[in-house]
Amino acid sequence: MASAMVCCARLGWRARYVGRFGSDELGDIGRTSLTNEGVDVSAAEVVAGAQTRFAMIIVDGRTGDRTVLWDRDPRLALSAADVPAAAVRTSRILLVDCDDVEASVAAATVAREAGVITAIDVEAVLPGLDRLLPLIDIVIASEGFPERWTASSETGRALERLHAELQPALTCVTLGPQGSLARCGGREIRTPAFRVPCVDTTGAGDAFRGGFIAALLQHGPEDVDVLLRMANAVAALKCRTAGAREGLPHAAELEALLAEDTRGTGVPQ
């Protein structure tokens, strides 16, 4: 989530992170790194005595694929009462994840009432998602989620069923080197990935979501193909460099890739 906000900030948009840090050195580093990237952390809380979430990432040097090992201090969890409603109401787009489903439900409810666009980063089938997902305008799922949610074995059919059930403006699944597959209205849109040297895929999903949000802010919702192409380009550029954020592009880098490579054009079905 934090990396998606950094992505938006690098592409020229104001971004705010809502969450919790521990009162440790890693927490100080995390807050400072976001502030240095131009992300507003005024709505983020420091929890006394808690340890900041830490992950160990193992990267396959041949493919750039990664395995993530992590643990989270339960004191970092957000409840519905912890949601800063004023910060949500003054946003243009709210992106939530599923770390704290009740908090995400509360935030999405406030956003809906205020006319704020809602988006979600969803990976796993969790308790409470049946209440959260209907509040979402833009569903961006990780590979495998549509199949798990719908008990359908084929990705395209699973995404179609997910979209029909939830009826958001857009339902999308990221597919790594295969790009993305989305449904918007009655259309299925396959967007190929951009071909770049892949060093590390860590954070590619955050990059895709941040790239999509930045594209939506820039271009509006009319041409979904353009938004998906930009999101795929941002994710590809991130994978050039090790680390979750180091490769996140600035606007000039993104524009250069979009100008030189036309293979990420959406293919409507």
Language-model-derived ranges and their functions:
Residues 19, 96-97, 121-122:
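Glycine- and other small-residue-rich loops at beta-strand/loop junctions that grip anionic moieties
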Residues 105-190:
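Conserved phosphate/ATP/ADP-binding segment of small-molecule kinases
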Residues 1-4, 26:
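Conserved donor sugar-nucleotide recognition element shared by glycan-biosynthetic enzymes
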Residues 5-14, 215-218:
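Alpha-helix C-terminal capping segments
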Residues 4-5, 30, 104-109:
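Aromatic/hydrophobic pocket-lining residues that form π-stacking "cages" and hydrophobic walls in ligand
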Residues 10-92, 255-269:
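Conserved N-terminal subdomain of the carbohydrate kinase-like
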Residues 154-269:
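Conserved phosphate-binding/catalytic region of the ribokinase-like
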Residues 75-84, 102, 120-128:
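Active-site glycine-rich loop that binds ribose-phosphate moieties when present
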